[in-house]
């Protein structure tokens, strides 16, 4: 299984190179499906969403399709994913994304699809790949989902936890001591990555790709 777990998407040349190394094709020969449901519940200005798509457009891909699994039937989105090289899971709310991965049935068939495709996660799209969504830590670090009382099982593709947006002014990931305190009771390795960093994962083997900052806990 090949995964590229990012905080902010394809934000620099190093992350772009990692993507095409995983795909094994040139950009102009690569097709991508953009999967946006995590963003649907986020309020306010969506300039970040537009910027994520612009970054993809600037890669000069063969094709960028959009398939919202919360809005269209499986018979419409599945053939498009089967024809793509990259499945790109946009950021937003990780719980909303995981709910629709389950409701749509995509969570069940992703392991088969990923035998031949590359999974790319952006923020929430990266967070859902762990064994669970780390509710308590997410509440502390992102100040969201306070109404939730129970954690949610993730895709369980990786055996670590991914926390995006290190040093972002919008979240509580500005200080290392806050993050360290928040994740101290997590059993397993923790990566906190800024928007210029990513993890390239091939069959469980992890490579850090970064032109920015990142922190690793519980090594």
Q: Where do the model's predicted regions map?
A:
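Short, active-site-adjacent cap segments at secondary-structure transitions
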Residues: 95, 126-129, 198-200
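C-terminal and late-domain segments of enzyme folds
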Residues: 1-28, 39, 43-50, 54-55, ...
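Catalytic nucleophile loop
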Residues: 88-90, 113-132
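Catalytic-core regions built around general acid/base machinery
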Residues: 80, 104-117
């Amino acid at each position: 299984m090949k995964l590229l777990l990012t905080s902010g998407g394809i934000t620099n040349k190093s992350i772009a190179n990692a993507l095409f190394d995983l795909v094994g094709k040139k950009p102009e020969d690569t097709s991508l499906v953009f999967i946006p449901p995590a963003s649907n519940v986020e309020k306010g200005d969506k300039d970040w969403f537009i910027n994520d798509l612009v970054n993809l457009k600037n890669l000069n891909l063969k094709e960028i399709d959009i398939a919202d699994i919360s809005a269209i039937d499986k018979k419409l989105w599945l053939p498009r994913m089967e024809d793509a090289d990259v499945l790109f899971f946009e950021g937003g709310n990780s719980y909303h994304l995981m709910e629709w991965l389950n409701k749509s049935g995509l969570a069940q068939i992703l392991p088969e699809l990923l035998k031949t495709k590359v999974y790319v996660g952006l923020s929430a799209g990266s967070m859902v790949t762990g064994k669970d969504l780390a509710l308590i830590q997410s509440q502390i670090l992102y100040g969201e989902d306070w109404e939730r009382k129970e954690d949610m099982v993730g895709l369980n593709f990786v055996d670590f936890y991914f926390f995006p947006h290190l040093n972002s002014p919008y979240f509580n990931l500005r200080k290392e001591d806050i993050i360290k305190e928040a994740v101290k009771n997590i059993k397993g390795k923790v990566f906190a990555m800024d928007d210029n960093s990513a993890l390239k994962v091939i069959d469980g083997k992890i490579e850090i790709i970064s032109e920015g900052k990142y922190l690793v806990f519980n090594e």
